[in-house]
Amino acid sequence: MAVTNQMVAPRYAKALLEAAKDQNQVETVHEELQALQSVFNDNPTILTIFDNARITAADKDALMTTLTKDASPLVANLLKLTQQYGRFGALPAIISAFNQAYDEEAGIIAATVTTAVALSADQADALRSTIAARFGMKSTQLDQVVDPSVIGGVRIQARGSVIDGTVKHRFDKMKAALLAD
């Protein structure tokens, strides 16, 4: 069975987080990984360069030197290790898994809130508090989506759960009940 990036990412992320905690470098590593993610988002071809046989070893070494130049030893070692084991393309998944573990350690939950109109600052703060309490976390990182088709109410998506209190959802449930045998 082939091991996918999604399978190895949590292992690398957990090991990196533990090493960062041991060296009191969690914040530094987190910031560097966010910067790396931006580089990969802006230049996605970087992720495939190390697998490309047409690119010389010297060019690959030069790229690795550039990527690790300002990196902490932990992040530099992660880059070199993933390249060495042919997992460089897994870095976005590893960064995502690290971010999840980091948020979990910090007591932060990521949630997407969909409403028909933009939330006021007070409404957003109230939702953050409610979501954090509901999931037993300290705070909520809120991503707000405005979708007029929900008509009213709020849909919250967090940790694979959906809490749908929208008017559209209620209408859909009523319609299904009316059409049921």
UniProtKB/Swiss-Prot annotation:
Q: Which residues form a coiled coil?
A: none
By its UniProt entry, which Gene3D superfamilies does this protein fall under? N-terminal domain of the delta subunit of the F1F0-ATP synthase (1.10.520.20)
- Matching SUPFAM superfamilies, A to Z? N-terminal domain of the delta subunit of the F1F0-ATP synthase (SSF47928)
- InterPro entries hit by this protein: ATP_synth_OSCP/delta_N_sf, ATPase_OSCP/dsu
Q: Could you tell me the superkingdom of the organism this chain comes from?
A: Bacteria
One Pfam family here: OSCP
Q: Where in the cell is it found?
A: Cell membrane
| Example of a GO MF term | proton-transporting ATP synthase activity, rotational mechanism
Q: Which GO terms describe its cellular component?
A: plasma membrane; proton-transporting ATP synthase complex
Function per UniProt: F(1)F(0) ATP synthase produces ATP from ADP in the presence of a proton or sodium gradient. F-type ATPases consist of two structural domains, F(1) containing the extramembraneous catalytic core and F(0) containing the membrane proton channel, linked together by a central stalk and a peripheral stalk. During catalysis, ATP synthesis in the catalytic domain of F(1) is coupled via a rotary mechanism of the central stalk subunits to proton translocation.
| Similarity remark | Belongs to the ATPase delta chain family.
Which NCBIfam families does the UniProt record give? ATP_synt_delta (TIGR01145)
Q: How does it assemble?
A: F-type ATPases have 2 components, F(1) - the catalytic core - and F(0) - the membrane proton channel. F(1) has five subunits: alpha(3), beta(3), gamma(1), delta(1), epsilon(1). F(0) has three main subunits: a(1), b(2) and c(10-14). The alpha and beta chains form an alternating ring which encloses part of the gamma chain. F(1) is attached to F(0) by a central stalk formed by the gamma and epsilon chains, while a peripheral stalk is formed by the delta and b chains.
The protein in question is named: ATP synthase subunit delta
